Amino acid sequence: MSDNNQALKDAGLKVTLPRLKILEVLQQPECQHISAEELYKKLIDLGEEIGLATVYRVLNQFDDAGIVTRHHFEGGKSVFELSTQHHHDHLVCLDCGEVIEFSDEVIEQRQREIAEQYNVQLTNHSLYLYGKCADGSCKQNPNAHKSKR
């Protein structure tokens, strides 16, 4: 049995061809932080006949099952990435939409200190930093918030 079949079963989902194909696409490095529409277009490019409504439904099921994480970066469009074992935060360019993942133990420690200061037991958090590419290589894009990875 393939790892993807087992992952779906472990999440309590029936193994179906659309779920397997969508999971395969999400595992491609360039398909992290991808919208439902972008995922649908990628499936079409691969010759898969999976409808947009099915893509939305499967992504919602994956989100509920913890297979993917849904992000709402500036611009309002949901993007998805496979859930990972390691925590990371995101830096997002407001002009071109590039998403950079990073981890910083100093930031993590400070967040734990703040939670303790306010007598809150921290269970989870998300940190999104927004800015603009400063190195002159930003490819301003009318479809900002499309991830480049």
From Swiss-Prot:
Dimerization: region residues: 85-142
Sorted alphabetically, which InterPro entries does this protein's record hold?
FUR (IPR002481), Fur_C (IPR043135), WH-like_DNA-bd_sf (IPR036388), WH_DNA-bd_sf (IPR036390)
Per UniProt, which keywords does this protein have?
Cytoplasm, DNA-binding, Iron, Metal-binding, Repressor, Transcription, Transcription regulation, Zinc
**What are the GO BP annotations of this UniProt entry?**
negative regulation of DNA-templated transcription; negative regulation of siderophore biosynthetic process
DNA-binding: region residues: 1-84
Q: Where does Zn(2+) bind?
A: 33, 81, 90, 93, 96, 101
Could you name the Gene Ontology cellular component terms for this entry?
A: cytosol
**What is the annotated role of this protein in its UniProt record?**
Fur acts as a repressor, employing Fe(2+) as a cofactor to bind the operator of the iron transport operon. It plays a role in the regulation of expression of the outer membrane protein fatA and synthesis of catechols which are intermediates in the biosynthesis of anguibactin.
Q: Tell me the PANTHER family matching this sequence.
A: FERRIC UPTAKE REGULATION PROTEIN, ZINC UPTAKE REGULATION PROTEIN
Q: What is this protein called?
A: Ferric uptake regulation protein
Q: Which gene encodes it?
A: fur
